[in-house]
Design a protein with these regions (language model features):
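Core catalytic DNA strand-manipulation module of type IA topoisomerases
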Residues: 1-287
């Protein structure tokens, strides 16, 4: 969900939506955090600290988000109870989630101040996701449609939107086109439907896709490897040492990487075990 607006999701969403590599995302986030020149405000830090895996936001920030939502979209887009997102157990919660420091400063205002293209794009992403995370849910009905034509039966399944909620502002990007929701238009029993075209598809079971920077960062978090502050340096290091190379957006092991992995697995199996790193992080937290 939208609650993970923050931490590794920043790197993932910037990769999916903006085609930013993780290093570029964190460099730009650092600039937004340290401050840029904004019209009538001077040098202004636009986002909170970005090396955090917290999902917590302050009551003041939530109130500022509600103020904007109410003026722009109306009361029905404000949820009945405030949305509070839980941070995972191994997360460091010293800072708030990554959010705009001044929610009233819209992306258009930032753009008009002459910031760089990267700064504008990343701020827009953070700002829209933060505002959307505090909006009402999108309500959808699951729909199954049976269609009969010339004695042949066809079936379509998908969703119809009852209330757009936060999606009026923001929809989460997906790595895979197939993940996107199949939204069907409003139809009722007995309606006639025009056939635009017929397409025959044959599907084969696909092997798992190679990691992109975004999906690798997600895997780091899900398995408990590292912290948001170490994700980018880790990826950069394995590329710089020629263990991994980029193939478009995907990351693939080099022959050196494969040999290194084989030797490490044979002789240092505990160290390359994913659980070893996660448990080490947990043990360090408990000290």
């Amino acid at each position: 969900g939208l609650g993970d607006v923050y931490k590794r999701q920043l790197q993932q969403e910037a990769s999916r939506r903006l085609s930013f590599q993780a290093r570029r995302t964190m460099k730009t986030a650092q600039e937004l955090y340290e401050g840029v020149e904004i019209n009538d405000m001077g040098q202004t830090g636009l986002i909170t600290y970005m090396r955090t895996d917290s999902l917590r936001i302050s009551d003041e920030a939530r109130a500022a988000a509600y103020d904007f939502i109410r003026k722009k979209y109306g009361d029905k887009y404000i949820p009945d109870t405030p949305k509070k997102y839980k941070t995972k157990g191994n997360a460091q919660d010293a800072h708030e989630a990554i959010r705009p420091t001044h929610p009233e400063v819209t992306p258009d205002m930032v753009k008009a101040s002459g910031v760089t293209s990267d700064q504008y794009k990343l701020y827009k992403l953070i700002w829209e996701r933060f505002i959307a995370s505090q909006m009402s849910n999108c309500l959808m009905d699951t729909v199954s449609v049976d269609i009969s034509a010339n004695g042949c039966n066809f079936k379509a399944t998908g969703y119809s939107v009852k209330f757009d909620g936060f999606t009026v502002l923001y929809e989460e990007a997906k790595d895979d086109e197939g993940e996107k929701k199949n939204v069907l238009p409003p139809i009722k029993s007995g309606d006639s439907i025009k056939v635009r075209n017929l397409e025959g598809n044959q599907h084969f079971t696909q092997p798992p896709a190679r990691y992109t920077e975004a999906t690798l960062v997600k895997a780091f978090e899900e398995t408990g490897i590292g912290r948001p502050s170490t994700y980018v340096p880790t990826i950069t290091t394995i590329i710089n040492r020629n263990y991994v190379e980029r193939d478009g957006k995907q990351l693939k092991p080099t022959s050196l990487g494969e040999v290194t992995n084989q030797l490490m697995s044979e002789h240092f199996d505990k160290i390359v075990d994913v659980k070893f790193t996660a448990n080490m992080e947990k043990s360090l937290d408990e000290v």
